[in-house]
Amino acid sequence: MTSGQSIDAPPETAVRELYRQILETWNKRNARDYALLFASDGSLVGFDGSQVNGQLDIGAHLTEVFMHHQTPRYVSIVSEARMLGTDVALLRASAGLVPPDKDDIDPALNAIQSMVAVRRGGTWKIALFQNTPAAFHQRPELAKQLTEELRAKLAEASRG
């Protein structure tokens, strides 16, 4: 399923699956399916601070990104998925990016991601997806720790 998650799945499971799908559609460079995971009034905040509002504009924005850039692929670790209300959930994760033609993450691209999902008409959609650079200013040990955790996750994914 590429357009959200059904009400049948437990909420936290459905939200984790929605997050998995957003990364998968990015990794496949599929702007259409990426945008369809958002609510019609959903918002995207990119790693560079760009803000895009609305499902159609998100799709158009990513079409341009994918046409003009060789985007790296994601590896991630979910740190939290919890309900904020009956039909609203929050997911937080750490993410690394593996540049094209490389087999290791680029630590300069590590990010903390936040996703707010809403259930509408029985389907989970993304209301907000935000990427924040994991700079950890003046705390290089945290940056190094995150990089090692993401590398371990990448190695695990490569094996399995």
Predicted regions and their residues:
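A solvent-exposed, acidic/Ser-Thr-rich amphipathic alpha-helical stretch
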Residues: 12-13, 18, 31-87, 107-108
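Hydrophobic residues on conserved beta-strands that form the core of alpha/beta folds
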Residues: 76-78, 90-92, 126
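Short beta-strand segments enriched in hydrophobic/aromatic residues
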Residues: 38, 95-97, 130-133
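Residue-level recognition of conserved beta-strand positions in structured domain cores
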Residues: 46, 92-93, 119, 128
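Beta-strand elements of well-folded, non-transmembrane domains
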Residues: 97-101, 117
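Short, low-complexity N-terminal intrinsically disordered segments enriched in polar/charged residues
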Residues: 1-40, 144-160
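A short hydrophobic beta-strand element
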Residues: 86-97
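Short beta-strand edge/turn micro-motifs at domain boundaries
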Residues: 110-141
